[in-house]
Regions:
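Structural detector of well-ordered beta-strand residues that form the stable sheet scaffold
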Residues: 42, 63, 106-108, 126, ...
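Generic structural signal for small/hydrophobic residues in well-ordered secondary structure
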Residues: 10, 28, 41, 59, ...
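PLP-dependent aminotransferase class I/II
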Residues: 8-17, 25, 86-87, 152-248
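Short glycine/proline-enriched coil/turn segments at helix->beta-strand junctions
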Residues: 15-17, 34-40, 79-84, 98-105, ...
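Short loop-beta-helix segment that forms the pyridoxal 5′-phosphate
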Residues: 8-31, 43-44, 66-67
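Conserved PLP-anchoring active-site segment centered on the Schiff-base-forming lysine
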Residues: 32-79
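A structural motif shared across PLP-dependent enzymes of the aminotransferase-like
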Residues: 1-8
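Active-site phosphate-binding strand-loop segment of PLP-dependent enzymes
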Residues: 68-154
């Protein structure tokens, strides 16, 4: 019953035929790359290092791409060799997935539950459900769970945790309330004169970035970890950004 409800809720939510649980978000990306038979994969420099690690584990060639001023992947910088693009909606700011129609697209929705049309323009949706994520089920960091939503009838579920599935089904009902709470919290900062990056765009407010003095930017850009790629926009942001966690 719980399993059937989980598949129905999350496959519909992400505009896919199937939704299954995996061990964590990194595993979800690894599995998505295998489903799509990806070989040359673009991903933004500004995202969690586990996204890059999933690419390396899957044996694909990664292309680390600069971001725009809102810290979402700059579609115009994607190399012609690429067949697949991993698109996270960083900090809950909606990336332009619709513009990627010429590629296979893995949409990372770990930080953006509550935004419109999630999964509508991508081939596969993944989401981490571990600590600090929008869908935080309170499990440990390594095995906190992940969702992969797809259209492949041949994909075999590698993990099913009824406790996590039940929590996610319950959280689905709370999405409007959680989103409203996050937006209200972000509005307090905006009203206090803090200029949050991406505040003029659709935003699910997992975290908010602004120009500040604390220099607590939450991710090391991937091109610093995996040299050979030029990302001047993100480089220009180094040591200039601060961030706020926005929780209900």
């Amino acid at each position: 019953m719980v399993r059937t409800e989980f598949n129905k809720i999350w496959s519909n939510y992400f505009h896919k035929e199937y939704a299954t649980l995996v061990e964590n978000g990194k595993t979800a990306i690894f599995e998505a790359l295998k489903i799509l038979n990806s070989e040359h994969v673009a991903l933004p420099t500004y995202t969690c290092h586990r996204v890059l690690q999933a690419c390396l584990d899957a044996g694909v060639t990664p292309y680390i791409v600069d971001c725009g001023l809102n810290l979402q992947i700059d579609v115009s910088k994607i190399p012609i060799e690429v067949d697949t693009v991993i698109v996270p909606h960083m900090f809950g700011i909606q990336a332009d997935v619709k513009s990627l129609s010429g590629f296979r697209v893995i949409e990372d929705c770990s930080q953006c539950i509550g935004l419109p049309d999630l999964g509508k323009y991508s081939d596969i949706v993944i989401a981490s459900t571990g600590p600090t994520k929008w869908l935080n089920v309170g499990e440990d960091k390594e095995k906190g769970g992940g969702i992969i939503a797809h259209n492949s009838p041949f994909y075999k579920e590698s993990l099913y945790n009824e406790n996590i599935a039940k929590k996610l089904n319950q959280m689905y009902l709370e999405i409007p309330n959680i989103l409203e709470s996050r937006i209200n919290k972000a509005s307090e900062f905006i009203n206090a004169g803090i200029d949050l990056i991406g505040s003029d765009q659709p935003n699910a407010w997992l975290r908010a970035l602004y120009f500040g003095s604390q220099k607590r930017i939450p991710y090391t850009p991937l091109h610093d970890r995996y040299p050979g790629f030029s990302c001047p926009v993100v480089d220009s942001y180094k040591n200039k950004l601060d961030w706020i966690s926005i929780f209900p």
